[in-house]
Swiss-Prot record:
Residues holding L-tyrosine: 34, 169, 173
Function according to Swiss-Prot or TrEMBL: Catalyzes the attachment of tyrosine to tRNA(Tyr) in a two-step reaction: tyrosine is first activated by ATP to form Tyr-AMP and then transferred to the acceptor end of tRNA(Tyr).
Any single Pfam family the record assigns to this protein: tRNA-synt_1b
Complex formation: Homodimer.
One of the record's GO molecular function terms: RNA binding
Taxonomic source organism: Streptococcus thermophilus (strain ATCC BAA-250 / LMG 18311)
Gene3D superfamilies named in the record: HUPs, RNA-binding S4 domain, Tyrosyl-Transfer RNA Synthetase
Subcellular location: Cytoplasm
Keyword set, alphabetical order: Aminoacyl-tRNA synthetase, ATP-binding, Cytoplasm, Ligase, Nucleotide-binding, Protein biosynthesis, RNA-binding
Residues that, per the record, bind ATP: 232
Name of the protein in its database record: Tyrosine--tRNA ligase 1
Length: 418
């Protein structure tokens, strides 16, 4: 199976320019290709992972990746299928984000070894020195307004309004392709399916300005089986930065993927062979309640993004929480697992009984409710039920002398720190 056939089999090809010419280019030898990442935040997220891992697959097949971080285009903002104008960021902010994103990309692509080692580029290196007049003369003249207006990403914004800044974005991305072709011989661009208009602006510029052919592959924007945009948890992006989305949170995200999506996501997000995935799928279908596909998916992706140790910690936390065995976890583990849970700080020598504690920490709304909660068995300290109204916290309730977890009911957790 060729690399192009494998990408198709994994569901990683949404659209291409001339497929026959593209297949021939892959057959004739190593292809230099690039994928662009605009710094719109200080971290990439799961939505970016499809293109990143596709780049890695191509590198493993012998092709040469260029990872372009948009230090210049990030200052402008891509309008593609956005309902409103992006907020412009300062140059200093974008520079900081560029640096962080470059660090993240180095986890997935090999920048050190072999003739096809990856190369990191920043489009500010060429846009930073070009004058407005030169850009209009040397690039702008190759694009008609009619051509630019025909892009679906622009059409969707015409009625609500689009600034010239964002309107010109497609020319900037097109010039990236031209520049990388001229400097490094890059002939293929890979990106999300929402980028088709911007990417083909690059092939158009190559054709008209340099009389050369370029290729484009778009990867699909991933949705779950209900059509919901993939990569968000509770409405928030699942980030690749462990300080923004912990490995435990990422593990839980994959573990909770719907049954109908799990095997498909194994093809897209893991490096297991298609034969292995087929076998996992068969076993999974025989006992879906055991969630084998989700467990394998969580293992493979968390290990890939954060490493084996982080994966093992996530599994350990999950198992102990499920068993209600909170005292088997360290304070560090609990802080990871309960990230975002309401926290109440008390003095280490504060001797509040359970009723006062529940009210002061706003766990129960009143002393009357607090008494009822305790008497009804709704209060748990570190996973153990407390029904004594005179119960007072002791040192044995302080995990690592740092933290106590109080649960009200089945799901409402609260953290006490000292």
């Amino acid at each position: 199976m060729t690399i192009f056939e494998e990408l198709k089999a994994r569901g990683l090809i949404f659209q291409t320019t001339d497929e026959e010419a593209l297949v021939k280019a892959f057959e004739e030898g190593p292809v230099s290709f690039y994928t662009g990442y605009d710094p719109t935040a200080d971290s990439l997220h799961l939505g970016h992972l499809v293109a990143i891992l596709t780049s890695r697959r191509l590198q493993l097949a012998g092709h040469k990746p260029y990872a372009l971080v948009g230090g210049a285009t990030g200052l402008i903002g891509d309008p593609s299928f956005k309902d409103a104008e992006r907020s412009l960021q300062t140059k200093e902010t974008v520079e900081g984000w560029v640096e962080k994103i470059q660090g993240q990309l180095s986890r997935f692509l090999d920048f050190e070894n072999g003739d096809n080692k990856a190369v990191m580029v920043n489009n500010y290196d060429w846009f930073g020195s070009v004058s407005f007049i030169d850009f209009l003369r040397d690039v702008g003249k190759y694009f008609t307004v009619n051509y630019m207006m025909s892009k679906e990403s622009v059409k969707k914004r015409i009625e609500t309004g689009i600034s010239y800044t964002e309107f010109a974005y497609q020319i900037m991305q097109g010039y990236d392709f031209y520049e990388l072709n001229a400097k490094y011989g890059v002939t293929l661009q890979i990106g999300g399916s929402d980028q088709w208009g911007n990417m083909t602006a690059g092939t158009e510029l190559l054709r008209r300005k340099a009389d050369k052919s370029g290729h484009v592959i778009t990867v699909p924007l991933i949705t779950d089986s209900t059509g919901k945009k993939f990569g968000k948890s509770e409405g928030n992006a699942v980030w690749l930065d462990a300080t923004k989305t912990t490995p435990y949170e990422m593990y839980q995200f994959w573990l909770n993927v719907m049954d109908d999506d799990a095997v498909r996501f194994l093809k897209i997000f893991t490096f297991l062979s298609l034969e292995e995935i087929e076998e996992i799928g068969k076993e999974f279908d025989q006992a879906r309640h055991q969630r084998l596909a989700q467990k394998v998916l969580a293992r493979e992706v968390v290990t890939l993004v954060h490493g084996k140790e982080a994966y093992e910690q996530a599994v350990h936390i999950t198992e102990q929480l499920f068993a209600g065995n909170l005292k088997a976890l360290s304070a560090r583990d609990l802080k990871v697992a309960l990230n975002g849970v309401p926290t109440y700080e008390i003095s280490a020598d504060e001797n509040l009984n359970i009723v006062e504690l529940l009210v002061n920490a706003k766990i129960s709304p009143s002393k009357r409710q607090a008494r009822e909660d305790v008497q009804n068995g709704a209060i748990y300290i570190n996973g153990e039920r407390v029904q004594d109204l005179d119960y007072t916290l002791s040192d044995t309730d302080k995990i690592d002398n740092e933290i106590t977890v109080i649960r009200r009911g089945k799901k409402k957790n609260f953290v006490l720190t000292y």
